[in-house]
Regions:
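Active-site hotspot residues in diverse enzymes, especially metal/ion-binding acidic/histidine motifs
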Residues: 1-145
Length: 145
């Protein structure tokens, strides 16, 4: 529930679950540009946080990627994952999984509004606009598994 709680606190603080609105309020520069191999990227240049989002994404994909990149700012500020991947043997996959989970929590910060008993995970995934695995992580976060 740690990541869900962080998302809920952020939504309550800014009065919205829209990640782009929150990023602008925080002072994160956002650029929407066409990219071929990336959906989005977060970086900090000269202490200025910056997010680039692939402009070729659907609205649903864009909202998820915005929340995913916001997660890197909220949860992983100061971690240079690209550097770690290229120069060390440290595994950084957990940063991406955490960012995916945070993005799902931003899409549905109040579980009672989106969870229906007995509903297949794929239905939840489709409603949130996330992959099956991310919907499973969300359920594990909500139910503490």
């Amino acid at each position: 529930m740690k990541i869900l709680k962080r998302a809920q606190n952020l939504v309550a603080q800014y009065g919205t679950s829209d990640a782009a609105t929150i990023m602008v309020s925080i002072g994160i520069e956002i650029a929407y540009i066409p990219m071929t191999n990336l959906r989005g990227i977060y970086n900090c240049i000269e202490k200025m946080p910056f997010v680039a989002i692939n402009s070729n994404l659907t609205d649903c994909e864009r909202k998820f990627v915005e929340a995913h990149e916001l997660a890197h700012y909220i949860l992983h500020r100061g971690v240079n994952r690209v550097f770690l991947n290229r120069t060390t043997y440290l595994k950084t996959d957990h940063y991406e999984r955490e960012a995916d989970l945070f993005a799902a929590c931003m899409r549905a910060p109040w579980p009672n509004d989106v969870l229906f008993e007995g509903e297949p995970v794929d239905n939840l995934a489709a409603r949130l606009g996330v992959r099956h695995e991310v919907a499973e992580m969300y359920l594990n976060e909500v139910y503490g598994k």
